Structures are given as C-alpha cells and as structure tokens.
A protein has these predicted regions:
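Extended beta-strand/beta-hairpin segments
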Residues: 1-47, 57-139
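Alpha-helical metal-binding/catalytic segments enriched in His/Glu/Asp
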Residues: 52-53
C-alpha cells in the first residue's frame, strides 16, 4: 500500500501535512507573505536531511555502546543568487568526548546512508495532477 500524505490549508499561506497521525505545519516568513508561525517547506526539507543524518549517527553509536552525550550536528547551506538555489549543503557532526578515532570515518559513512539524501541523489519520478472533488477517489 502506498504511503499517503493528506494536505490541508488552515489559512493564509499556512499548509499542514497529515501523516501517520502527525500534523506537520508549515508557513512562510513574513517577507514571503506568511506569518512566520512555522518553518517553511524548504526548511522542513533541509531539516529532514539533517535529522536523517543525525539518526544514522545515533544508530551507529548505539550499536557500539558509545555515549552520545555532547554529540551534536549542524547543517549549513548558502543561497547562490546567480543560480537561484543552494548549490552545496554541509553536514558537520561534533563527536562526543571519548569518541574512538578509529570510528571517525565509519560514522561519516553511516550518516551517508541517509535515505532522504539518497532520494535527492537518485530522484524519484514526480507525477503532479489536479482533479475536481467529484473526480477524486473516496477517502
């Protein structure tokens, strides 16, 4: 069965995604006509990359009984005005105290397993359509 996300429009330019019983709210910054009440869709997209890498870092440490206290991750990206996109995104993991040097390369490889990033590198086909409510399947 396909995974489905139901999207609702609560007002202004706010958009909500409903998935697995969770509600993910988005908005736009004021300069883009929003109320800045939630992250923008692009901020959620980039956050999903960062949190996915973080998940794999934590999973790596847990499998080796390495304490994650003090471990942190940040992701940075800069806008390129000419290409009108973010040409590079950098993920940096700050290792916890006592992290074994022998695992530094391995934890990077673990973070590289992020499924979100893999879907960017091997992009799925996107199919976009519009239907009238009378044509939509019953939900």
């Amino acid at each position: 069965m396909a995974t489905e996300i139901e999207v609702h429009f609560p007002g202004d330019v706010q958009v909500e995604a409903h998935i697995r019983g969770f509600v993910i709210s988005t908005d736009q910054p004021e300069k883009s006509g929003g109320n800045n009440s939630a992250p923008s869709p692009f901020e959620l997209f980039t956050s999903s990359i960062a949190t996915c890498a973080g998940y794999f870092a934590v999973k790596f440490c847990r499998a080796r009984n390495i304490d994650t206290a003090g471990m942190s991750l940040k992701m940075a990206y800069d806008w390129d005005k000419e290409s009108k996109r973010y040409p590079k995104m950098s993920v940096e993991l700050t290792l916890p105290e006592g992290f074994p040097e022998k695992y530094r390369g391995a934890i990077i490889k673990a973070m590289d397993q992020c499924v979100v990033k893999k879907h960017i590198l091997e992009a799925p086909e996107f199919e976009i359509s519009a239907v009238y409510s009378s044509e939509a399947p019953n939900r």
